[in-house]
């Protein structure tokens, strides 16, 4: 497979995905050399980039990202094969979900703590938690470490048409049209989870918004797409100054 097999700006997508990995590492969301981010580089979404197998996110560069085809059954036989879980999950997402142009799967501390509860629901108790009101899928049927393609298929089915999923006993995944959209959602999802964990830690009753207010706040978030792009671009400017090799 070569760059000529794709129809989108693969160079820019590589830079953005490498930036998302570096930024997530700086935030402390990564887990050793596991977890995985991917981004489609073809119009049908099936050709996608994913971070290289077991390379620490603080070191990943744009040129390191591995180009895969979701329909290529021989992918795991390649010398540069991605992590088995990355292939199982992301090949299914890019093959089955039209909204999965970008898929960020990770186990950040607060969201993963919330995923370990019997009820991992993010409740609308402030404006950030309300962003996700009625807009998340909840995968409540953890099937073990996702090294089998069947588990990836199950996860894709559980997500349905959502763009954000809380995966009980596992972690979270955000989807988007762009890396900026998916990363901004991930940032605010972890913030929302942190708010939930801190609120629960008080042992006091939560002040949950009414349905109408929560929906209004969520809609306001959806109307402010420009802020998502600005957020990601500002974070990339920090990398441009402090870790410019992410673009290499």
What are these model-derived regions, one by one?
Residues 1-248:
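Glycine-rich flexible loops
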